[in-house]
Curated annotation (Swiss-Prot):
Residues flagged as site, Cleavage (non-hydrolytic): E75, S76
Annotated protein name in UniProt: Arginine decarboxylase proenzyme
Stored Gene3D superfamilies: S-adenosylmethionine decarboxylase
The UniProt record lists the keyword Lipid metabolism: no
UniProt cross-references to PANTHER family, sorted A to Z: S-ADENOSYLMETHIONINE DECARBOXYLASE PROENZYME
BP-aspect Gene Ontology terms: arginine catabolic process; polyamine biosynthetic process
Keywords recorded for this protein, A-Z: Autocatalytic cleavage, Decarboxylase, Lyase, Polyamine biosynthesis, Pyruvate, Schiff base, Zymogen
Entry PTM: Is synthesized initially as an inactive proenzyme. Formation of the active enzyme involves a self-maturation process in which the active site pyruvoyl group is generated from an internal serine residue via an autocatalytic post-translational modification. Two non-identical subunits are generated from the proenzyme in this reaction, and the pyruvate is formed at the N-terminus of the alpha chain, which is derived from the carboxyl end of the proenzyme.
GO molecular function: arginine decarboxylase activity
UniProt pathway: Amine and polyamine biosynthesis; agmatine biosynthesis; agmatine from L-arginine: step 1/1
Pfam families: AdoMet_dc (PF02675)
Length: 128
């Protein structure tokens, strides 16, 4: 049996906020540290006033190995993927509802990983 969750604003619409980007030239030790990356994502969930459902992480070997961390939140998700060969990561923070702050989650992770440069993009994923 599954529960149905509906996010509505005062205007009776779904509010979707999507912040995503690319992080370049990150310390290789941080990029490969699965526990560090998972801890950062979990802390970002708290900072952004999100409600965690479950978090999973995976470490991948090989030439283009890295780490992936996915946090399923009631409001949607945070996904962090790293590629150690390129000192590169992608970060995706998507939330529904007005109470969460995906920009705060994105900013926290970027500040913790200290990339030499990064790109950030914003998308309004609201229903109207």
């Amino acid at each position: 049996m599954s529960e149905q969750v509906t996010f509505q604003s005062h205007e009776d619409r779904i509010v979707g906020k999507h912040v995503f980007g690319n992080l370049y030239d990150i310390d290789p030790e941080d990029l490969n540290n699965e526990q560090l990356l998972k801890d950062l994502v979990l802390k970002a969930v708290e900072i952004a006033h999100m409600n965690l459902v479950e978090a999973k992480s995976w470490s991948f070997g090989g030439k283009k190995g890295g780490v992936s961390v996915i946090a399923l939140i009631e409001e949607s998700h945070i996904a962090l993927h790293t590629w150690n060969e390129y000192n590169y990561a992608t970060l995706d923070v998507y939330t529904c509802g007005e109470d969460s702050d995906p920009q705060a989650a994105f900013k926290f992770i970027v500040e913790a990983l200290k990339p030499r440069r990064y790109q950030v993009f914003f998308a309004d994923r609201s229903s109207s």
